[in-house]
């Protein structure tokens, strides 16, 4: 019987726990986007447009992030996955 008890004892996390975890992820994501300037989405699209003049890429091959430090310093990070020739 102990073998059957082993399989019965596994419980799924409650819906409240799952909802709490999802909410924490959403809140963390929104906090990260709150500090971005208003011009950032347009700047990102313009950067992608310039890259597309020279290389055929899709939007998911470009990652643009703006990190702000406590020292009033902003860092723009751009990662582009280039296709093979």
Swiss-Prot record:
Keywords attached to this entry: Cell cycle, Cell division
GO biological process, one term: regulation of division septum assembly
Superkingdom of origin: Bacteria
InterPro entries assigned: MinE, MinE_sf
Keyword Cell cycle assigned: yes
Pfam family for this entry, one: MinE
Family recorded in the similarity comment: Belongs to the MinE family.
Main function: Prevents the cell division inhibition by proteins MinC and MinD at internal division sites while permitting inhibition at polar sites. This ensures cell division at the proper site by restricting the formation of a division septum at the midpoint of the long axis of the cell.
Protein name: Cell division topological specificity factor
Annotated gene: minE
